[in-house]
Amino acid sequence: MNIEETSNPLKASDIPSNPMSRVKIILLATAGLIIIAIYYWSFDAVEFSFLKLKDGFPNMMDFVSGMFPPDWSIYKLVLVETILTIQLALIGTTLAAIIAFPLSFCAARNTAPSWIYHIVRFFFNAVRAIDTLIFALIFVAWVGLGPFPGMLAMAIHSIGMLGKLFSEAIEGVDPGQVEALESVGASRIETIRWAIFPQVSSYFISYFLYRFEINIRVAVVLGLVGAGGIGYILSQYMGHFQYDRVSVLMITILVLVMSIDALSGKIRSKLL
């Protein structure tokens, strides 16, 4: 028998069509068009324009040329405001850590009842959801301009982040040590002191330093709205078009942030 006569090659027309594949193609095409429309609408809303960048380029060149040479005659003022910026970040972060530390044990599933856990977690999420600048405006209306409202705003927002990180570290401890102490009749406080805290203390310090890094940058931004520090005098010099002094502040901010990040990073790498 001829093999060619008995073979029944599969033809393209014999392959059953899959209606679902067509539906998927239509859905994907529709989704793609919607995404493109959203991006087009968003670009239009923010008035994105390469033409504006081109037309404004001479202004940018004037700004850059005005920054040189830097006016280092203000170094004493810059030093004072740099110290204030560090103090803002330090006090704000420390106050946040003091409050977040006990609350974090109330926000961990393995150290708090369910109803307390949900209440404290909701508080952490709520204060994290509100930006530091919004808190700053609230406290400025309360106590007036100056470093104090900026520090309070920084502290309140930091409580949410530190509390979340602290509580997650607590939930990640080795349960074996906890169960060992509980089996010999240790109280809840004793269990936290001898089984949980030794496991999370290095993480707490690391998270504190990490938040301090962030708050250095936050302190600069808060200064732009009247909280003092480098950001405040930066806004003043920008408003008076003293770009040679602005360059000094930009250099100072760059050195400050990079130095704090490097130092904090080394300490955290040794802790973890």
Language-model features and meaning:
Residues 1-94, 106, 114:
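N-terminal, non-cleaved signal-anchor transmembrane helix
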Residues 43, 247-272:
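C-terminal transmembrane helix and the adjacent membrane-cytosol boundary/short C-terminal tail
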Residues 79-87, 120-127, 209, 213, ...:
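Alpha-helical membrane-interface segments at transmembrane helix boundaries
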Residues 93-101, 105, 109, 133, ...:
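Hydrophobic positions within alpha-helical transmembrane segments of bacterial inner-membrane proteins
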Residues 103-136, 165-168:
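Cytoplasmic-entry segments and transmembrane alpha-helices of multi-pass inner-membrane transporters
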Residues 124-158:
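Generic hydrophobic transmembrane alpha-helix motif, especially the helices
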Residues 141, 218-253, 272:
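Glycine-rich helix-loop "coupling/hinge" segments at transmembrane-helix boundaries
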Residues 145-211, 262:
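Membrane-cytosol interface at the C-terminal ends of specific transmembrane alpha-helices
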